[in-house]
Curated annotation (Swiss-Prot):
Residues 90-108, 150-161 have a biased composition (Basic and acidic residues). CDD domains: REX4_like. Its EC number is 3.1.-.-. The lineage of its organism: Eukaryota, Metazoa, Chordata, Craniata, Vertebrata. This is RNA exonuclease 4. SMART domains: EXOIII. It comes from Xenopus tropicalis (Western clawed frog). It holds the Pfam family RNase_T. It is found in: Nucleus. One of its GO terms (cellular component) is nucleus. GO terms for biological process: rRNA processing. Residues 26-42 have a biased composition (Basic residues). Keywords: Exonuclease, Hydrolase, Nuclease, Nucleus.
Amino acid sequence: MAKAKVKQDQSPSGSALGKAANSQKQTKKQKKKKFWKNHPKIAGKTSEAKTLFPLLPPKQPQEFSSNWKALQELLKPKLNPAAPATPSEKFPKKDQKVSEKKNGDPEPPKSTPKINGGITSVTPKEAKAPSQAPPTKAVEVKKEKKRKIKAEGTEQLDPPKKPQGGTQPEPPKVDIWFDDVDPDDIEAALGPEAGRIAREMQGVTETAPPTAEKVLVKEKAFEGLTRTVAMDCEMVGVGLDGEESMLARVSIVNLFGKCVYDKYVRPTERVTDYRTAVSGIRPDDIKNGEAFKDVQAEVAEILRGRTLVGHAVHNDLKILFLDHPKKAIRDTQKYKPFKEKVKSGRPSLKLLCEKILNVKVQTGEHCSVQDAQAAMRLYTMEKKCWEAAIKAKYAGVTAAKAKGPQKDKQPPAQ
């Protein structure tokens, strides 16, 4: 028998399939190219349609976005706010019924009553009708309590009503953004209202104005003699009309305002005018005072080698029959910067303290201790500038004296 021929597999190979797929892709691309070449206007329609109607910003209220209008509606306040819940809504009906049963009248019996051995029918209305017996006091008290509780509940739930009528607007407050500045400094710079607001912001209670003693005397300071002292004297009138003056009191304070010397002087002549309204001296004060010569010697010893401060201090030295170097005297009445500040040629001590120290002195009877303290406080405020001016003044004088008129010296003959 002849051998049967084996049929070869007629299925295409992998390379043949790949070539067929590539040919199909190429034909698709070619078709697309031909289509777009023949129909060029169709592709450009979308771009033209976009450019035909450019977007412009809205000019009239009708053109605004609906979303914007909806947002405006939401922002408007609601006209009908939700009504507050009544006290009856807070508690369920079951609880109310239970409370009514507890506090109300007793319910009638369910069983029908017997009359003469027979049973009478009772309607439901008659069974539910409350008894006409007068309520007891305890029940009335409970009912009154309930009414009060309900009234209080409704008052708490109702929102507070705003007072009708035009209310006056509060005055605008000063905007103080700094909180590390002393309220006293703010008050001095911006006024009392700004100082008050600064104290409120910092939680500081407004204190009373400082007394003269706190301003003029330094607390816990040295109480002995210092290189600079201030002196003041009080005088009484002697003679026929009391016009002539005599020493009655001498007071000396140190640099810190501490009193180091204060003595009354026994008069050597008959006093005709004590000048109590001004000097504060009374007969009992000088009756047992020190002798004038003793006081004079003690004061001279204190002033020796020290700088003397005072107000019109030349009058005090004159009444004591003492002298002091002009270079070591600091008179607050003659200091030019003080004169310019208060705009006065001969300012009083009272005026200087009121304008510069913001303290009132000599409001009634004068006190020599307080006057000396005030003069010393004025000096310590201007001590640096005052001493620099004195130093420059006397340095120029000494330099001028040192130069002097010089004669031209001829050279010696040889």
